């Protein structure tokens, strides 16, 4: 950051920044070429011009190589014996276009370089992971024609040895530059080296100084500096201005999980405190200096608008089914905020506006703040575009892949841990796996023979369901050999269901995720805890032998809560019918307890043990 009242020599700054950027010249000559005096003097061309006036950053003008003259020879003009005709080219360099940004790993798919990241508690049951991406520069191919600079007013100044030699003020219409009537179209200039300044009228030229600040930022605020040798020649010379922003552009992208994380109108602003960020810049062409000064009052830079909710791609999740896991909103190309070189993003915060009526996960965003102060000390540079990507997580506890750590996603993923299960009952330390056991054709049977049974069992009615729930015996039924009935003589030796292939649903967990005696088929008790956690107020309501009431998902989010909780952890929600570890005494123990969980309802039930369906594994910590 450049401290207040510190000065940088323009040429030093020009030669230091952007020395590797390559651009392509576009010719757009305008009428009324200007007649210049000349004398017998020639010099080498400096071969550098700046993309951004405020930083005086140099960009080498080239199509195929790193060196190319900024002055090009044209057709013979009508110059007199002591003058040379010149014309100007105007082209737009612009910023990089926004690319798709992943949400599971925040930088995945990002076209750019992550320069800072942080995590924070956003309040109201939400967490945020922030990454700042320096967007990739547009790639310019040899011979490619750049788009014209926007039609607007521009000023061109020519300085030599700190003295202004010429000034033109006029309007560029996309093809031609027309000088205003009150400015001479012909000014005397001797051949030699000149520093040309060109800038849109977002920048002001007064009392020999060029000034601009936070209030002047715009996608159309453009400038350039070109060091040029005016030759002693009869042919027209063309001075090329490839215009870039004198600001750093900062856009916002907010990611969420599920296909509809965002609803309603959402907008906001970057806020700052007095004396924390650069507020104005003053260029002194006569002395070759640049001075930055801090903003002296608290302020904010509002984004014009965000897009509405944008759905992510359809992704394969399980059993050949697809789902949309993510969604996002973003400030479009023309809706960024423009900050000065040297600004540090950790001196800013993002606040949703007071008139924002929208929601994230159906939580109101009005006046809420997403902090940036934990970001690494990242300094913005002139002419570059940045995207602040903030991914919003619904706060919940998960078990991580060390099988010890329990906590919310954001701080633990920042440590390099990966979630393996969602905590659904903290008192009993019960966790539900993030996905089903890998699918097999026709599903997995509870048992491949109806004579295979548990020792302890209940009738298939509401009282029997409640008694079965109260046992919380999923792990025991899976791993304790003494829970399996051997009276029929079918399993005299391998009574542990997880180790017996005659119990396919249990056997699938024998070495699940490389762990033994950890993962298990949940009993009715574990399922009861999970359904209550996920929004079913009373999972036993309406249960009978003949019918089961379809119980709607509660919570303000409904089934979307399941989508958010599982998608944000890299899994997927329940959407099938599943085995429980318990069986029913009714019908000669031929049926086992089941849970049906669809996008609109859930309930307990029962099915023949030889039917095939899904297994959602559970684990305790």
Where would I find each of the regions flagged by the language model?
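C-terminal, surface-exposed recognition/capping segments
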Residues: 525-621
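Short aromatic-cysteine micro-motif
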Residues: 424-520, 524-525, 529-537
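Sec-type signal peptide cleavage vicinity
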Residues: 37-47, 60-400, 417-419, 449-487
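Residues that flank catalytic or metal-binding motifs in active/ligand-binding sites
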Residues: 152, 246-248, 426-428, 517, ...
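A motif-centric signal for short, conserved binding hotspots located
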Residues: 331-340, 510, 535, 545-552
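Residues within well-ordered beta-strands of beta-sheet-rich folds
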Residues: 197-199, 251-253, 431-433, 518-520, ...
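Bacterial Sec-dependent N-terminal signal peptides
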Residues: 1-76, 617
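GGW-centered surface loops in extracellular recognition modules
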Residues: 380-440
């Amino acid at each position: 950051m450049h401290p207040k009242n510190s000065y940088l020599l323009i040429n030093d700054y020009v030669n230091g920044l952007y020395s590797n950027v390559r651009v392509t010249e576009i010719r757009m000559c305008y009428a009324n070429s200007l007649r210049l005096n000349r004398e017998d003097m020639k010099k080498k061309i400096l071969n550098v011009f700046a993309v951004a006036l405020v930083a005086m950053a140099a960009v080498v003008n080239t199509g195929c190589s790193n060196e190319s003259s900024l002055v090009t020879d044209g057709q013979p003009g009508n110059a007199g014996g002591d003058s040379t005709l010149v014309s100007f080219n105007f082209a737009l360099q612009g910023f990089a276009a926004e690319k798709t940004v992943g949400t599971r790993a925040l930088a995945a798919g990002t076209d750019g370089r992550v320069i800072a990241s942080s995590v924070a508690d956003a309040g109201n049951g939400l967490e945020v992971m922030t990454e700042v991406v320096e967007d990739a520069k547009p790639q310019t191919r040899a011979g490619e024609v750049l788009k014209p600079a926007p039609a607007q007013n521009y000023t061109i100044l020519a300085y030599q040895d700190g003295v202004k030699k010429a000034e033109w003020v006029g309007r560029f219409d996309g093809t031609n530059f027309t000088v205003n009537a009150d400015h001479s179209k012909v000014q005397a200039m001797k051949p030699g080296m000149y520093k040309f300044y060109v800038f849109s009228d977002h920048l002001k030229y007064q009392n020999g100084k060029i000034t601009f600040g936070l209030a002047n930022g715009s996608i159309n605020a453009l400038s350039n500096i070109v060091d040029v040798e005016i030759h002693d020649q009869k042919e027209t010379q063309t001075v090329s201005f490839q215009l870039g922003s004198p600001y750093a552009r900062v856009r916002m992208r907010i990611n969420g999980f599920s296909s509809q994380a965002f609803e309603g109108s959402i907008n906001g602003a970057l806020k700052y405190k007095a004396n924390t960020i650069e507020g104005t810049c003053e260029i002194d062409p006569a002395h070759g200096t640049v001075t930055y000064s801090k903003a002296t009052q608290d302020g904010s830079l509002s984004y014009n608008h965000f897009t509405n909710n944008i759905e992510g791609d359809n992704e394969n999740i399980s059993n050949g089914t697809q789902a949309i896991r993510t969604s996002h909103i973003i400030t479009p190309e023309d809706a960024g905020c423009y900050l000065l070189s040297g600004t540090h993003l950790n001196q800013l915060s993002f606040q949703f506006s007071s008139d924002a009526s929208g929601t994230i996960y159906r939580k109101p965003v009005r006046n809420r703040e997403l902090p940036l102060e934990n970001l690494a000390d990242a300094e913005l540079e002139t002419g570059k575009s940045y995207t602040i990507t903030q991914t919003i997580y619904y706060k919940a506890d998960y078990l991580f892949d060390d099988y010890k750590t329990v906590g919310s996603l954001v701080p633990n993923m920042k440590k390099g841990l990966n979630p393996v299960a969602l905590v659904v009952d903290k008192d009993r330390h019960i966790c539900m796996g993030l996905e089903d056991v890998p699918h097999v054709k026709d599903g997995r049977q509870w048992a491949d023979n109806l004579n295979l049974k548990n020792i302890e069992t209940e009738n298939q009615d509401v009282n029997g369901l409640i008694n079965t729930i109260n046992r919380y015996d999923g792990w025991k039924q899976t791993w304790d050999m003494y829970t399996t009935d051997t009276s029929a003589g079918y399993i005299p030796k391998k009574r542990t269901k997880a180790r017996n292939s005659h119990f396919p649903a249990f056997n699938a967990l024998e070495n699940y995720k490389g762990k033994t005696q950890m993962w298990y088929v949940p009993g009715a008790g574990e399922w009861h805890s999970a359904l209550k956690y996920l929004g079913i107020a009373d999972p036993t309501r309406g249960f009978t032998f003949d019918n089961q009431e379809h119980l709607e998902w509660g919570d303000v989010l409904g089934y979307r809560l399941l989508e958010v909780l599982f998608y944000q952890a890299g899994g997927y929600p329940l959407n099938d019918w599943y085995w429980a570890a318990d069986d029913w005494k009714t019908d000669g123990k031929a049926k086992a307890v089941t849970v049906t969980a669809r996008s609109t309802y859930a309930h307990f039930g029962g099915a023949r043990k030889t039917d095939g369906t899904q297994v959602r594994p559970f684990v305790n910590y």
